[in-house]
């Protein structure tokens, strides 16, 4: 049985960078769940999962002009619908030293339901200010919002969704007693990696 280490949280918190560094340092297989979400969404839509089917049929305008509260609620429902596919893929990965995987898909409630112990899961979320300032620098943002008539409002809604998502993740971590780090930008990547390594029990 593979040893799998999960990093959940919300976007723009440092999850990917942390996982990449740890995968190289400890020779772990790195599984970035975001790279597979489109495929999972297609599978779930074909199975009639309502949120995945709905999103598949929506335009960028329809997706990003929704109220942030609704976007956040449906984001959690989306991850519920695709979660099984991520777990199935992880079971198929061979790796002698273990697997480190990260993504917002690893929602605390879903991890608890799947029986993932607190020693194998943690979440990293950003503060609102850190999230928005860094998201504005990301090159893919214009492509995601392509097709939206009011791109600034669409971006505002997107950020609102992720702020709400991060708050709910932190709430669930407290509820299920999972380790959680809040990144406000003052935490250097070395410190973030170090705290994650200590939590997972990695040894130099």
Task: Give the location of each predicted region.
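NTP-dependent small-molecule kinase module
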Residues: 164-204
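Short glycine-/polar-rich loops that comprise or flank the Walker A/P-loop
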Residues: 115-120, 176-177
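Walker A/P-loop
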Residues: 16
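A glycine- and Lys/Arg-enriched "phosphate-lid" helix/loop adjacent to the NTP-binding pocket
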Residues: 118-165
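Short beta-strand-centered segment that lines the nucleotide-binding/catalytic pocket of NTP-utilizing
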Residues: 28-44
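ATP-binding Walker
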Residues: 12-13
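Hydrophobic anchor at the beta1->P-loop junction of P-loop NTPases
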Residues: 7
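ATP-dependent small-molecule kinase phosphotransfer cores
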Residues: 39-98, 105
């Amino acid at each position: 049985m593979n040893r799998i280490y999960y990093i959940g949280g919300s976007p723009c918190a440092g999850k990917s960078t942390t996982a990449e560094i740890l995968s190289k340092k400890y020779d772990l297989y790195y599984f970035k769940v975001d790279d597979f979400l489109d495929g999972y969404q297609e599978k779930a839509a074909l199975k009639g999962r309502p949120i995945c089917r709905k999103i598949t049929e929506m335009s960028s305008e329809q997706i990003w002009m929704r109220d942030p509260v609704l976007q956040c609620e449906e984001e959690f429902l989306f991850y519920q619908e695709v979660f099984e596919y991520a777990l199935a893929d992880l079971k198929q990965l061979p790796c002698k030293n273990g697997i480190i995987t990260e993504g917002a898909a690893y929602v605390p409630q879903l991890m608890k339901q799947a029986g993932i112990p607190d020693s194998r899961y943690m979440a990293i979320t950003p503060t609102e200010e850190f999230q928005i300032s860094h998201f504005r620098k990301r090159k893919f943002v214009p492509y995601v919002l392509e097709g939206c008539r009011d791109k600034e409002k669409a971006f505002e809604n997107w950020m609102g969704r992720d702020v709400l998502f991060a708050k709910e993740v932190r709430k669930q971590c407290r509820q299920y007693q999972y380790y959680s780090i809040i990144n406000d930008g003052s935490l250097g990547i070395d410190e973030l990696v170090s705290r994650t390594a200590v939590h997972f029990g990695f040894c130099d």
